Curated annotation (Swiss-Prot):
This is Glutaminase liver isoform, mitochondrial. The lineage of its organism: Eukaryota, Metazoa, Chordata, Craniata, Vertebrata. Keywords: Acetylation, ANK repeat, Hydrolase, Mitochondrion, Repeat, Transit peptide. Its main location: mitochondrion. It is an enzyme of class 3 (hydrolase). It is found in: Mitochondrion.
Length: 602
């Protein structure tokens, strides 16, 4: 049977008819009955025990080879067009941003460049018909379909970001904390700066506040440098020179653990030693370039800069770090042959690398995504390196506040004297916050408040119960209409003439031929009510079967005739002919293929 089932198989590979629901006979009007029939493929997904896991995704090439690409493109067009023959490009980009995707996303470069070229070459005034739309989206159809089906890690992205914005505004009112003054260049930072950016593991983006202003990574670079070292050298080798335990001391103490090595990579001594391990056979410039290339990949090639003023300021006033360096040298903590001054120089350089909240959030999302950059798809860090890094961030990342942060927030994070906080929600998203005023423990005053309120509202804490935590929101769950895909919702949309709802159902891979316990479909209901737009959508976009009989033996055409909806009658009669022809052609093709297969076996 030619219908939306082929599309559903390609998108969901799940779903069943389940329990029976109820709609009345057309002679009584298609009234809402008592029962419901759940779409089990979607309902079962809600009983998950893990926050989010990526299922194997079909590539655009696979979709094209299976003949599904044109159907996906058509359905996407109908969903966005909302009954219009052409789509304004700005309407497409607005709908795209509502899913969390940005037009600047590298994965959509081909799609957006084609749209721009179409506008320049055609006289359509920025309008795309179905054919032009197909050409533009064909190379990104799988990603776009997932976005509009709300199949990303945070399905209701606009609702989620609305909550984030409110938390941001609450933290904005805070006035406590002081800008760090012990590094002269940082003392000039504007205390009113306040920005938050997030990037999910699916590449959904949101920014609020001062998110395009460059700032130095400072200590936020420590977990990144450690991750690079473990990825290139391995865990065992790196931890010959640095430990894994919280120190219980200030981050810049001259102190070693019982084994005579720095306590962990998040204190200055540990970070300096880790810096010394990178490309030991290379000169200073090559070492810095090597790390910078890694950081660029983690940030998806977004903004990355270098503050020479901060670097020089660090070198001129870094007496404590020089003391730590000489202490480490005296205790023989560096690998044999390492130049201690070169290691300190690299450490100062890396602390002076600049990012914005936006590029920093992508770096955090790369950690959240197991080392794979979400906006480029490039595998940057090993899974082992990411696991180790997040573990150390969780236990040692927030200076002397690490224990309390792990207790109250329960997420891996790293703070910096620049006022930055790099926050990771594993398997969900990464965030970068910036607010220069620091509390007495050296963490961003606004940033700490933001993180605490975020976890008090959402069940992101590592030990929040994902099944039974009723007081907290779970943005990973699909809400409302998407979650409750029932035959009642489908038939009620057809009854009320809500084509927009039907488009969303179809794009979400709902079976558009579902029946209630009277065996009535959405096409039966729409035909009985005379909703010509609904009937058109069901037969043109969804290709539903018009010959389904209800328990009284009526097909949708019979209902249209009974209630004297002449336009619907004409439309269904024409569709009957084309549907029967296509069915015949499909059967002939299937028989021919079976015959060829049989002959090849003989």
């Amino acid at each position: 049977m030619r219908s939306m089932r082929a599309l559903q198989n390609a998108l969901s590979r799940a779903g069943s008819h389940g329990q029976r629901g109820g709609w009345g006979h057309p002679s009584r009007g298609p009234l809402l009955g008592g029962g419901v029939r759940y779409y089990f493929g979607e309902a079962a997904a809600q009983g998950r025990g893990t926050p989010h896991s990526h299922q194997p995704q079909h590539s655009d090439h696979d979709a094209s080879n299976s003949g599904m690409l044109p159907r996906l493109g058509d359905l996407l067009f109908y969903t966005i067009a909302e009954g219009q023959e052409r789509i304004p490009i700005h309407k497409f980009t607005t709908a795209l941003k509502a899913t969390g995707l940005q037009t600047s996303d590298p994965r959509l470069q081909d799609c957006m460049s084609k749209m721009q070229r179409m506008v320049q070459e055609s006289s359509s005034g920025g309008l795309l018909d179905r054919e032009l739309f197909q050409k533009c989206v064909s190379s990104n159809i799988v990603l776009l379909t997932q976005a509009f089906r709300k199949k990303f890690v945070i399905p209701d992205f606009e609702e989620f970001t609305g909550h984030v914005d409110r938390i941001f505004e609450d933290a904005k009112e805070l006035t406590g904390g002081k800008v760090a003054a012990y590094i002269p260049h940082l003392a000039k930072s504007n205390p009113d700066l306040w920005g938050v950016s997030l990037c999910t593991v699916d590449g959904q983006r949101h920014s609020v506040g001062h998110t395009k202003i460059p700032f130095c990574l400072q200590s936020c670079v420590k977990p990144l440098t450690y991750a690079i070292s473990v990825s290139t050298l391995g865990t065992d080798y790196v931890h010959k020179f640095v430990g894994k335990e919280p120190s219980g001391l200030r981050y810049n103490k001259l102190s070693l653990n019982e084994e005579g090595i720095p306590h962990n990579p998040m204190v200055n001594a540990g970070a300096i030693v880790v810096s010394s391990l990178i490309k030991m056979d290379c000169n200073k410039a090559e070492k810095f370039d090597f790390v910078l290339q890694y950081l660029n990949k983690m940030a998806g090639n977004e903004f990355m800069g270098f503050s020479n003023a901060t670097f020089q300021s660090e070198k001129e006033t870094g007496d404590r770090n020089y003391a730590i360096g000489y202490y480490l040298k005296e205790k023989k903590c560096f690998p044999k042959g390492v130049d201690m001054m070169a290691a300190l120089d690299l450490y100062f350089q890396l602390c002076s690398v600049e990012v914005t909240c936006e590029s920093g959030s992508v770096m955090a999302a790369t950690l959240a995504n197991g080392g794979i950059c979400p906006i480029t798809g490039e595998s940057v860090l090993s899974a082992e390196a990411v696991r180790n890094t997040l573990s150390l961030m969780h236990s040692c990342g927030m200076y002397d506040f690490s224990g309390q942060f792990a207790f109250h927030v329960g997420l891996p994070a790293k703070s910096a004297v620049s006022g930055a906080i790099l926050l990771v929600v594993p398997n969900v998203m990464g965030m970068m916050c910036l607010s220069p005023p620091l509390d007495k423990l050296g963490n961003s005053h606004r940033g700490i408040s933001f993180c605490q309120k975020l976890v008090s509202l959402f069940n992101f804490h590592n030990y929040d119960n994902l099944r039974h935590c009723a007081r907290k929101l779970d943005p990973r769950r699909e809400g409302g209409e998407v979650r409750n895909k029932t035959v009642v919702n489908l038939l009620f949309a057809a009854y009320s003439g809500d084509v927009s709802a039907l488009r969303r159902f179809a794009l979400s891979a709902v079976d558009m031929e579902q029946k209630d316990y009277d065996s009535r479909t959405a096409l039966h209901v729409a035909a009985a009510e005379g909703h010509i737009d609904v009937v058109k959508f069901l037969i043109e976009a969804c290709k539903v079967n018009p010959f389904v009989k209800d328990r009284w033996g009526n097909i949708p055409l019979d209902d249209a005739v009974q209630f004297n909806h002449l336009e619907v009658v004409k439309l269904l009669q024409d569709y009957h002919d084309s549907y029967m022809l296509s069915e015949t052609q499909a059967e002939v093709a299937a028989e021919t293929l079976s015959k060829e297969n049989l002959e090849s076996m003989v």
